Amino acid sequence: MTIQTDDFAPAPPRVVSAAPASPQEEAIERALRPKLLDEYVGQAKVREQLEIFIGAARKRKEALDHVLLFGPPGLGKTTLSHIIAAELGVNLRQTSGPVLEKPKDLAALLTNLEPNDVLFIDEIHRLSPVVEEILYPALEDYQIDIMIGEGPAARSIKLDLQPFTLVGATTRAGMLTNPLRDRFGIVARLEFYTPEELALIVRRSAGLLKVDTDAAGGFEIARRSRGTPRIANRLLRRVRDYAEVKGNGRITEDIAHKALVMLDVDPQGFDLMDRKLLEAVIHRFDGGPVGLDNVAASIGEERDTIEDVIEPYLIQQGYLQRTPRGRIATLAAYRHLGVTPPSSRSDGQDLFGI
């Protein structure tokens, strides 16, 4: 049997992916980030909590309690870490869980922090157990134990640290160990944004990019952005390109609609991968329930990518259900794809009684 290698080729980058597409895009994101809480749009409850906690810490001239931010990618966890440091008037040191391979990597960061500084660890759920063990006394007592020497002559010494705030970010809060999770005094979940909130973000970003955009054009981009600011800003830049080449440079509702159709982003913000996932569940697995590994194999995508990037929005919007027995396509998914659901589902009841 001949195997076509194209069947196993990685999927092309998605314009509606919440992950940064390139270092260049990360640089653009940094330029568009709000710098202070007053500039931050959305996440009203989280913003209010941080205003109070930061204000209290600043008033007492103490380090802010350690903060855990979790939620789907692209919702502003990194942005909030920068804002927290800016509001406190302290330095920010940034790293990620996979980078901290050895205890000495973390020790080097911790011992160089100044009083009340913020240490931001992205993907904190990916810290190795040995590094995580070093972090516990640092978070509780502002102390770390490090080993000096090797072999029989090795000994442990205790180093005092300056008070600091750890801001941890993760898309997989369930993968955090209980001891680590319990050491965060402030825990905040970031939710998907409403189209109205994203329209404000698009308008702000358009102003910074000097893009002429009317309200209807901005809202057309916002409503297809999957509740995610990173996607909204990316779509804004792609629609800007279309407007400059196919129009007069101004983003109107019509221009935005045509550009997004060209990009294969439908009115719900779904792209080819979203539709492939829903079609696979409906057509290949009779609507489900189907296990995640089977779904991943059927559409040629990584399990983690489906779970972290594709699924959350489909579930949040009510097109997919995650059950103990597997994934199930909802009636909304059938309607969106123009497929007649089985009679047992047409009345709103699940085919499998789940």
Curated annotation (Swiss-Prot):
Its EC number is 3.6.4.-. It is an enzyme of class 3 (hydrolase). It comes from Variovorax paradoxus (strain S110). Belongs to the RuvB family. Its main location: cytoplasm. Disulfide bonds: none annotated. Residues 194-264 are annotated as: Small ATPAse domain (RuvB-S). It catalyses: ATP + H2O = ADP + phosphate + H(+). Residues 1-22 are annotated as: Disordered. Residues 5-193 are annotated as: Large ATPase domain (RuvB-L). The RuvA-RuvB-RuvC complex processes Holliday junction (HJ) DNA during genetic recombination and DNA repair, while the RuvA-RuvB complex plays an important role in the rescue of blocked DNA replication forks via replication fork reversal (RFR). RuvA specifically binds to HJ cruciform DNA, conferring on it an open structure. The RuvB hexamer acts as an ATP-dependent pump, pulling dsDNA into and through the RuvAB complex. RuvB forms 2 homohexamers on either side of HJ DNA bound by 1 or 2 RuvA tetramers; 4 subunits per hexamer contact DNA at a time. ATP binds at residues 32-33, 74, 77-79, 140-142, 183, 193, 230. It is found in: Cytoplasm. Mg(2+) binds at residue 78. One of its GO terms (molecular function) is ATP binding. DNA binds at residues 303, 322, 327. Keywords: ATP-binding, Cytoplasm, DNA damage, DNA recombination, DNA repair, DNA-binding, Hydrolase, Nucleotide-binding. GO terms for cellular component: cytoplasm; Holliday junction resolvase complex. It holds the Pfam family AAA_lid_4. GO terms for biological process: DNA recombination; DNA repair. It comes from the Bacteria. Residues 267-354 are annotated as: Head domain (RuvB-H). Homohexamer. Forms an RuvA(8)-RuvB(12)-Holliday junction (HJ) complex. HJ DNA is sandwiched between 2 RuvA tetramers; dsDNA enters through RuvA and exits via RuvB. An RuvB hexamer assembles on each DNA strand where it exits the tetramer. Each RuvB hexamer is contacted by two RuvA subunits (via domain III) on 2 adjacent RuvB subunits; this complex drives branch migration. In the full resolvosome a probable DNA-RuvA(4)-RuvB(12)-RuvC(2) complex forms which resolves the HJ. HAMAP family: DNA_HJ_migration_RuvB (MF_00016). Has 3 domains, the large (RuvB-L) and small ATPase (RuvB-S) domains and the C-terminal head (RuvB-H) domain. The head domain binds DNA, while the ATPase domains jointly bind ATP, ADP or are empty depending on the state of the subunit in the translocation cycle. During a single DNA translocation step the structure of each domain remains the same, but their relative positions change. This is Holliday junction branch migration complex subunit RuvB.
